Amino acid sequence: MANQTIIDTVMKTVSPVIEPPYELVDVEYEKMGSDYILSVFVDKEGGISVEDTVTLTELISPLLDAIHPDPFPEQYMLEVSSPGLERPLKTPEALTKAIGSYVNVSLYKAIDKVKVFQGDLVAFDGDTLTIHYLDKTRQKTVEIPYQTVAKARLAVKL
């Protein structure tokens, strides 16, 4: 089973049980060295604690063990954690919540010869992201069609 199919299966299985105040942010499945790691990223207002990750792991693990047929080709390690400061913004809802935040947006196709923009997300209407960014010393604004976004995440301003 391809990694994306595994990720989709895990998302479909665990998303109904991750209830407020928690939010399922992302799922990743990858090989690290000789091990497979299934990472489930969960967040809540104010961040999650170690106790939260233990509680969520105890909730999620039996659900994954009950999936039939087993989608995992090998044994894996389950990791439940916070998405961190540079959390991915994978849905329109996540982008809407991120308005006013500093973001990094990678594009499938360049706009004015630029494929990566980093700046303040000032608006998102479901179709277009508006970002204020610094080009050398000049403040600029770019409007990015949502369908051209390859990857978006929160960014840390240094």
Swiss-Prot record:
Entries under InterPro entries matching the protein: Ribosome_maturation_RimP, RimP_C, RimP_C_sf, RimP_N, RimP_N_sf
A GO BP annotation: ribosomal small subunit assembly
Subcellular location per the Swiss-Prot or TrEMBL entry: Cytoplasm
Source superkingdom: Bacteria
GO cellular component: cytosol
Chief site of localization: cytoplasm
UniProt keyword annotations, A-Z: Cytoplasm, Ribosome biogenesis
SUPFAM superfamilies in UniProt: YhbC-like, C-terminal domain, YhbC-like, N-terminal domain
Family statement drawn from the similarity comment of this UniProt entry: Belongs to the RimP family.
Function: Required for maturation of 30S ribosomal subunits.
Protein name: Ribosome maturation factor RimP
Organism for this UniProt entry: Streptococcus uberis (strain ATCC BAA-854 / 0140J)
Encoding gene (name): rimP
